[in-house]
């Protein structure tokens, strides 16, 4: 009788552990699928802000409650792959680049994250970004660019204007390599 109670108690303990593990797996799957996910940067288009092979923590739910904002670093679902870019203009904005200065709605935008790249371009005797615009961003779309303007496929040259529904989430933090952990917003 005591032996049978012991076996029943062991079985109940195993069942309890299996339920806990199952719940944890379902929780992780749902969290990753709908709320938060890792993303690996591929290429140098966001350098020096983000580097090739860095891993990011992406907030996938933020845009369920709000719209992308200028300056957000976002993950975009393309036809064949995902891209990481910075939001430069929102629907209705007029975007223009003149002599390496960005203008949104005829106001010059300070892009402090480009200082390193602008200095490098200046030393080469070139502009970091070719002149373009003015261009009005249509409803339901955003204009994005990579921080490495000389080496980025973005709204200027290949990706085109991005539908807001193609934005999968906002980068929040670099999580790997550990020595480079930092907020990205």
Spans of model-derived segments:
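Hydrophobic (often cysteine-bearing) scaffold residues that line and stabilize catalytic clefts
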Residues: 18, 23, 42, 67
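Soluble "head" domains of membrane/secretory-pathway proteins
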Residues: 2-14, 26, 30, 48, ...
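Aromatic-capped interface at the extracytoplasmic side
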Residues: 30-46
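Hydrophobic membrane-insertion alpha-helices, especially the h-region
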Residues: 19-34
